[in-house]
Amino acid sequence: EHADRSGYYAKLVAEELHLPKSMVKHIEYAAMMHDVGKIGIKEEILLKASKLTNAEMVEIRKHPLIGEKIIAPIEFLAPIAPLILYHHEWFDGTGYGEGLLGEEIPIGARIVAVIDSFDAMTSDRPYRKALSCEIAIDELKKGSGTQFDPKIVNAFLKVLENEKKKNNGKTS
């Protein structure tokens, strides 16, 4: 499922970047819980099979803040709250949340953004079929430097390559 895959890949990317062990754990947990705020979004919006209206987009864009409000008061999860809050920020500053730019976005949130996008692209959605890994990888490369941190994209591509070798040519 999305949360498990997100946590798995986020951990591998954080390790690939040689981040401290405690940070790796936080990033793994944040990746698993990044969409917890969707609990506060109407199901008909989440499951809608057609294009969202502007009003529905405004609603869906509240999920990182809702998630942060759920997670922040829980003492042992508090360190991951900013990662959840900022996982839809774009590297070039045009994402949503607070319009953070580049390194202003916590590295964990930048990792979650790449993993979340890749998993979303390679999974069936109510409004479209899953894209192939190859197409999703191309999309990540296209978004590198605008939507995504190029350093994170490169680390994730390395992780995917390692996973492919480990699994005899298949990406899990």
Task: Give residue ranges: language-model regions.
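Metal-dependent catalytic cores of enzymes that make or break cyclic nucleotides
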Residues: 1-172
